[in-house]
Amino acid sequence: MAKTYNAGVKEYRETYWMPEYEPKDSDFLACFKVIPQDGVPREEIAAAVAAESSTGTWTTVWTDLLTDLDYYKGRAYKIEDVPGDDAAFYAFIAYPIDLFEEGSVVSVMTSLVGNVFGFKALRACRLEDIRFPLAYVMTCGGPPHGIQVERDKMDKYGRPMLGCTIKPKLGLSAKNYGRAVYECLRGGLDFTKDDENVTSQPFMRWRDRFLFCQDAIEKAQAETGERKGHYLNCTAGTPEEMYERAEFAKEIGTPIIMHDYLTGGFTANTGLANYCRKNGLLLHIHRAMHGVIDRNPHHGIHFRVLTKALRLSGGDHLHSGTVVGKLEGDREATLGWIDLMRDSFIPEDRSRGIMFDQDFGAMPGVMPVASGGIHVWHMPALVSIFGDDSVLQFGGGTLGHPWGNAAGAAANRVALEACVQARNEGKEVEKEGKEILTNAAKHSPELKIAMETWKEIKFEFDTVDKLDVKHK
């Protein structure tokens, strides 16, 4: 018997609300935090999100008969209350894997956070988490190299790596910029970094910066006997220009380059990650613009989703927040997305905001980068929070040392090694941090001065985007 077509508008929940559905291992699962307009039932708005982010539109169309909608449609299968928030609820939606292009984070994001976020029936909508099925994960390139390969390339083991963002971030000439890089690296840092908005400006063109920074790396390596690097920002206005900068960085022998993955876009990021994998370059990822997307607790995309998307798109480092510094970051939530960067399998853990199990299989991990308003007094907490597989990046906390960049770098290196040694001896580094640093400073005048300089500096502001479990 032929299918019949009934024109007109019908409620979304007639087709897309399926509370009896059992998600498959191959399904994408998404958790949206939703605030509907007044009078719109929860089931209807959950079904509307499922429809508008998959196969549905505002009216029935005859071409629905030309495909198997029951297979391809998104399914709203569960609704939950949000702790401490009577206005919002969680809508859980399952999507068949065939809705998304293989290996394309762009395809996934276009569907899940596309037009649906402008839907009039929604007052607010936030994508809290995605479960990427392992079958899909295996189609993505992931990090160009990963944590272990980076350690082997840089010949650094048993401790976090140390970095520094060169300041002032804008205005220096290429030669003065390179001098600042050299002083930091010879003082004891492993890496220095372009800030996110350092690209190719009239005061410092990219090619000049690359050359002076590479000279600084080679000179510092010769003096210290350690491998060094500087994150050369290849973010550009066009993909062609981005690849030209990456190619030049490879030619001069730099070990690591950088990309602003949100402003640059996932297409550019995945392409650059593929280039780095083929050409032996490490890739540092900055998250500039994330606060626009993830900070509002009711609308946007949670950073844990952006973290997963970056791991699939490709990057060896990713800025993760610090918990203790100047930037936004709830401790438990931060620990959750650090696990999502590094671990192979991350179980559901609502206490950290992780809504689904996530299996990355054999995909390499991403090194979290703690950066933003940190100094030597934060070192015990940073070592405790981030562990060894991380980069602790001090900008002003290096360059602001009264004795100069090299002294600031030396202070950070001494503080780091003292904390790592104390941890390895079984001490509770966070609780005993003051004593650990004070003892280390007896043998390091650079550390002593740094501790005196920043002893009163704190960033004690309440977190805006708290975990929902903390609102109870």
From Swiss-Prot:
Residues at the site labelled Transition state stabilizer: 326
Active site: 167, 286
Additional remarks: The basic functional RuBisCO is composed of a large chain homodimer in a 'head-to-tail' conformation. In form I RuBisCO this homodimer is arranged in a barrel-like tetramer with the small subunits forming a tetrameric 'cap' on each end of the 'barrel'.
Family statement drawn from the similarity comment of this UniProt entry: Belongs to the RuBisCO large chain family. Type I subfamily.
Name recorded for this polypeptide: Ribulose bisphosphate carboxylase large chain 1
Compartments where found: Cytoplasm
Oligomer status and interactors: Heterohexadecamer of 8 large chains and 8 small chains.
Keywords: Calvin cycle, Carbon dioxide fixation, Cytoplasm, Lyase, Magnesium, Metal-binding, Monooxygenase, Oxidoreductase
Catalyzed reaction equations: 2 (2R)-3-phosphoglycerate + 2 H(+) = D-ribulose 1,5-bisphosphate + CO2 + H2O; D-ribulose 1,5-bisphosphate + O2 = 2-phosphoglycolate + (2R)-3-phosphoglycerate + 2 H(+)
GO biological process, one term: reductive pentose-phosphate cycle
Record PTM N6-carboxylysine, positions in chain: 193
InterPro entries, alphabetized: RuBisCO, RuBisCo_large_chain_AS, RuBisCO_lsu_C, RuBisCO_lsu_C_sf, RuBisCO_lsu_fd_N, RuBisCO_lsu_N_sf, RuBisCO_lsuI
Domain of life: Bacteria
Textual note on the cofactor: Binds 1 Mg(2+) ion per subunit.
Top-level EC class: lyase
Binding sites annotated in the UniProt record for substrate: 115, 165, 169, 287, 319, 371
Assigned GO CC terms: cytoplasm
